[in-house]
């Protein structure tokens, strides 16, 4: 018990220095994955950060660039080995999970391609591919592939294929009237 308390204090003491070195949690994750460091002080700081927020973003999952979380990473679950493309927007309480049961037809982790928009509470489970420019509706449960330029809604899942490419950038109107959108890891002025 005493050792656990000491370890917890050490992690709390070292956390600010780790974040000074890596700037944000995603840079720390990138470092841990690149160097295959799944244990140690930096991994403990990363895991504690996720635990405090009720989230899990697997160290071995891959982001093409940093996704945008409009409500922060509270309650987000992204399993190991998931691949998420450029310009993803992921709302709160989303689960992007692998299917690891031996008797499943869907064994593996999801692949989410570029310009995806994943609504609050959505669940994407197993070895599925979400195509480019797709939207996943709030509370949708996705268990099969979604083609490019589609919307997946409800449970049981329905897929609506769109004729034209959808603009899934996340827009924000600021108090001064400026409109900005999130793309390639940054907000840009419209």
Please give the residue ranges for each predicted region.
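Left-handed beta-helix
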Residues: 53, 59, 64-65, 70-71, ...
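Conserved beta-strand-loop-alpha-helix hinge in the C-terminal portion
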Residues: 150-152, 156-170
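Terminal amphipathic alpha-helical/low-complexity segments used for targeting or macromolecular assembly
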Residues: 1-54, 164-190
């Amino acid at each position: 018990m005493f050792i656990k308390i000491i370890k917890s204090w050490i992690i709390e003491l070292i956390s600010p220095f780790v974040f000074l070195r890596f700037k944000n949690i995603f840079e720390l994750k990138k470092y841990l994955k690149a160097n295959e460091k799944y244990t140690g002080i930096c991994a403990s700081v990363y895991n504690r950060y996720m635990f405090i927020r009720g989230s899990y973003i697997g160290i071995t999952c891959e982001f093409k660039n940093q996704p945008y979380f409009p409500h922060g990473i509270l309650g987000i679950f992204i399993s190991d080995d998931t691949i998420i493309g450029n310009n993803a927007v992921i709302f709160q309480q989303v689960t992007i999970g692998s299917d690891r049961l031996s008797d499943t037809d869907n064994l593996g982790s999801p692949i989410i391609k570029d310009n995806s928009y994943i609504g609050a509470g959505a669940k994407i489970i197993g070895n599925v591919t979400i195509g480019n420019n797709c939207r996943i509706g709030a509370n949708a449960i996705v268990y099969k592939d979604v083609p490019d330029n589609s919307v997946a809604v409800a449970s049981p899942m329905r897929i609506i294929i769109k004729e034209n490419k959808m603009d899934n950038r996340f827009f924000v109107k600021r108090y001064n009237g400026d409109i900005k959108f999130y793309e390639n890891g940054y907000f840009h002025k419209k």
